[in-house]
Regions:
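Nucleotidyltransferase catalytic core that binds NTPs
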Residues: 2-156
Length: 156
């Protein structure tokens, strides 16, 4: 199992990739959307990232481009796990200050345009929030999804 972390010091190297836009050609033109981790069917050599991806901003684009680059080089498929509703809405229901940049429909469209092949929108519940990071990585990402590589930002 290999893990790749996109650290702060790598961002400068990846800037040119971002400036070129989503330039790695996507082998599959259609995004496949799954509404839970259990719906996802194993694919060949999944290259995975996870996060809320609200706004698909500059940092997200760098991670997505790296995900696609690795998938292309490893003959894998890109997989992105996100959550609905946003975790803060579940964990802090009385905090009405959270304003999302995109609706889920907009996020799906942006991720499709970015060239993601598989999008898992997992329900974020109080019960799911009790999953430890170790359980999430070991039980879900490694054992259930059988990932080939994991790409994450430096702040995750």
């Amino acid at each position: 199992m290999n893990y790749l972390v996109c650290r702060k010091d790598l961002f400068n190297k990846l800037i040119s990739t971002f400036e070129q836009g989503f330039n790695i050609q996507n082998r599959n033109q259609n995004l496949k959307v799954y509404h839970s981790i259990s719906e996802f069917k194993n694919v060949s050599r999944p290259i995975l990232t996870t996060g809320t991806f609200d706004g698909v901003h500059f940092g997200h684009k760098i991670i997505i481009n790296r995900l696609k680059e690795i998938a292309q080089n490893q003959k894998g498929e890109t997989v992105l796990i996100t959550f609905s509703p946003h975790p803060r809405m579940v964990l802090f229901p009385d905090d009405h200050q959270l304003q999302l940049i995109n609706t889920m429909e907009e996020k799906i469209k942006l991720l499709e345009q970015a060239g993601i092949e598989h999008l898992i929108i997992h329900p974020f519940t109080k019960d799911f929030s009790r999953t430890t990071s170790m359980q999430f990585v070991r039980d879900i990402i490694v054992n259930q999804l059988n990932i080939h590589k994991l790409v994450i930002g430096y702040n995750h």
